[in-house]
Amino acid sequence: YQQLYICSKLIDVLKKIEKHGDIVGENGILVIPSVSNMSMDFGKRFWISDDTDLNRLFPGNPSGESGSRVAYAIMETTKGYRYGIHLPSFYLGGTFMPHIRLLDPEHGSTSLANLFGLPYVIEAKSRPFDRTTLHNNWQRNGTEAFSLYTGMTGKIDDELAAQAVSSILRFLTRMGIIRYYSHSGYIASVLKEGDLEPIMTEAAGI
């Protein structure tokens, strides 16, 4: 729900920017708030009919099962866009600081990730199952991909949502796609996912 809420707030701002003629030149911005509305209505994270994770079906197949056809349609619809910002849900509960995750970052992509102005950028090496994710397939199709983890999934957090919206608008402004005033944000700390260690408590409680 958090990701859908962020997209709705982002669209509200982008409509005003477009109305004032502040989308620069011939730039186009596409926002896809949700690709599985029925699943959300039932409070499910995966595809409602067969519990499939859509983010494991890319690049999709136009002649495949329904989820695979949806994945294919997303790839076709976003083909040719220079940048792609994915707001993935997270498979674990809890909250965390909003951050950008890069998969096998190419030269310069970390610098671009810093333009979001979030506290952290995580560099990760792709694993075999990443080959079927939206992020990986965008990259293979020539789209600079960023995964923006927004700090919450199943619930709505206004403060974290506002931070995510601001970071996207900041990136679009700094890339010369829109004209919009925003504060400078953070200078990101760049971390390698392989250097992170889980810390487990030995007992319940504080």
Label every model-predicted segment.
Residues 1-206:
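Structured catalytic-domain cores with a bias toward divalent-metal coordination
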